[in-house]
Amino acid sequence: MSNEIVKFSNQFNNVALKKFDAVHLDVLMAIASRVRERGTATVEFSFEELRGLMRLKQNLTNKQLADKIVQTNARLLALNYMFEDSGKIIQFALFTVFETDPANQTLEVSVNERFAFLLNDLTSQFTRFELAEFADLKSKYAKEFYRRAKQYRSSGIWKVSRDEFCRLLNVSKSTSDSVSNLNRVVLKPIVEECGPLLGLKIERQYAKRRLSGFVFTFARETPPVIDARPVKAKEEQDSGHWTSVAGYGEVFTTTELFDVTAARDHFDGTVDAGECRYCRYDARNRERHARNAGTLF
């Protein structure tokens, strides 16, 4: 199964997913990878497909998997979401349809129109990562840290207070109140799993001798600068080749100076058109910016 891309509004990272374990998080992100940019259309998964997306290593029966799926949505419904523009707090009903069929081993989901903005029409201020990398992490704390780090992938730095860090990662009070417990239960698995993957370093901040926050630094995802040849010269090219871009399949390109990361940023609209290397490289690409078009000039 080709690697899938998870993409959602940064606002979703402000929601603390309470009572989610590692499997619940994998279920949610697997679903998110397939419903993105699908509006409110109903999307069906087979249990076999879901297992593949989750890279499920636990030997769960179909009934146990069905229970985990149902629990995932139940935990979402137990959360509150605050709309930034109005300050209203409502039940986090992310899906209007969430139908689990253990007998036929299928799941049907449809995104609630009210929350569709979290997963659709994303051209700026969003988090994006590879589902396979997320699923391969074992600790729920490593998974929750990973998606926040991906929000800041372009800067490579996340500054957060101790209290906010513990809230976002849903750290229990008994763990958050004790520095030794916080180090052992939360930070240790984050360092062990995300350290090699992200090049992670942690700077602890103190106020009045008390641990007050963290500065996490990690490798920036900055595409290399490419050689921008004159547009006229490029337009004269009449041949190209197919190149595989994870999450987008095969992309036809007429440039030999191809960069996968820059291409994904162009397709997703991670960067504005004015800063996009492919839009600067060829004016024709501007018409296709953030539209998932399968051609690059």
From Swiss-Prot:
<keyword id="KW-0235">DNA replication</keyword>
<dbReference type="GO" id="GO:0006270">
    <property type="term" value="P:DNA replication initiation"/>
</dbReference>
<dbReference type="InterPro" id="IPR000525">
    <property type="entry name" value="Initiator_Rep_WH1"/>
</dbReference>
<keyword id="KW-0614">Plasmid</keyword>
<dbReference type="GO" id="GO:0003887">
    <property type="term" value="F:DNA-directed DNA polymerase activity"/>
</dbReference>
<protein>
    <recommendedName>
        <fullName>Probable replication protein rep</fullName>
    </recommendedName>
</protein>
<dbReference type="InterPro" id="IPR036390">
    <property type="entry name" value="WH_DNA-bd_sf"/>
</dbReference>
<dbReference type="InterPro" id="IPR036388">
    <property type="entry name" value="WH-like_DNA-bd_sf"/>
</dbReference>
<dbReference type="Pfam" id="PF01051">
    <property type="entry name" value="Rep3_N"/>
</dbReference>
<comment type="similarity">
    <text>Belongs to the initiator RepB protein family.</text>
</comment>
<dbReference type="Pfam" id="PF21205">
    <property type="entry name" value="Rep3_C"/>
</dbReference>
